[in-house]
Amino acid sequence: MTEFESTRDVASQLIVAAILIGVFALLAADRVHRVLVPLGAVALVWLISYFTPWRLISFEGARLAVDLNVILLLFAMMALVGVLKTTNVFPWAVDRLLVRSRGNPSRALSFVIWFTGVLSALLDNVTTVIFTYPMAASMAQRLRINGSAFLLPMVMAANIGGTATLIGDPPNVLIGADPRSGLTFLSFIENLAVACTFMLIVLVWYSRRYYPADVGSAANADRPEAIVPSGAELQNVPLLRTTAWIALAILLGFLTHSLTHMPVAVPAVIGVAAILFAQDYYYLKDHKPTAEERQHGVLAILEKDIEWPTLAFFLFLFILVGAAVSTGMIESLAHALSWTVGRISSTAGLSPRATLLVAALLVLWVSGFLSAVIDNIPYTAVTIPLVASLLGHLEAGTDGQVLWWALALGACLGGNGTLVGASANLIVAGIAERAGERIAFMRYLVVAFPLMLLQIAICHAYVLWRFF
């Protein structure tokens, strides 16, 4: 059968919506492995697409829907962390961090949250959690507390910190790259950094309240037994030094994205290829392995440290969201938002400034909720033209830049709401599952969704204070 154009009628959109609702229901029920849920959904989408009149998405459309930039970035960062593990740098760093915190869980959590938030603003939230997970998990283990008390605040801090800069979260990259927004790297920091800093403070408070026995007032005491050195020493220092220099080059590639316009996967893949070659060189030089022993070198990293199930989950999830885009479902939601703004404005006889306020708050809240249930990357890509259209209908002289900030805040922070709301959430869940610390959909939801509502409410107040 030849490839086809997706049908964009209401029936096709309702079918895709029903499938997505089913996916979330199955993930919440937690009865089957999370990878099987989107896999089965994609199979159902193609059965419908190729054997019924409703053409949801073709194979070619699915291929284009998969964000190879995200998949390759994740692969590269997982491989980089795998190489760093062979140098023993993470246990070595944890020893020193616990000494600095005097074994106090509350103080240690504050460090994890602030370190993750700042690093996420400089890199991006996905790369950050891949790097910080080994340290956060090790600190929780050494302190003998619930791993979720460190891991969930860590991933939320990554999503908050990434909101502050143009390169910290993919929605911001899309918004900043669109010439209609007119936004720069500095303008993101100027307009969003204050809000994100306050939300990190709130996250520290919320985490201590939610986990009082682990990191709250009941645990706010030094634990001398936790700062006894584990005896971890750095191994293969030449490889660590080489990896550090190449990692700095990768970071430079990330930071110059607005100038080079290279997808972030490009410097990541180039850098990790060099690192893997270096790892293989030092391994052969130091060990003189037999053919069988060599299986413990690069192949061990590729087999054990790459979260293949998580990458598969992303691949199938991208296809499902691609079906929502190709059938026009997301576009219909965006137009419904535009219609609502116009209806409220005309019915209430609002002034241009009041109309702008209504539009900004609707964009903020709708983006927050939708980004919690669908991938925020295609949502943002489809909503950018809507925001530009809303700006075109504003009266001359009205500064509509607030709509871009509302979109950025809602799309980025909405990802904190559910386990599938942001790529960083799924990465942490995948790595934790392999380590025996399973983070179920509902377990994440009951912790994170109330915080997401609080964050969006804070952004609501911030938009009013900062722009009106």
Locate each region found by the language model.
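Interfacial loop-to-helix junctions that mark the boundaries of transmembrane helices
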Residues: E3-S12, A29-R34, I57-V70, L183-V194, ...
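Structural signature of hydrophobic alpha-helical transmembrane segments
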Residues: F4-A18, V66-A79, L122-V129, T165, ...
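Hydrophobic mid-bilayer segments of alpha-helices in multi-pass membrane transport proteins
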Residues: S12-F24, R31-R55, D67-A79, L240-I250, ...
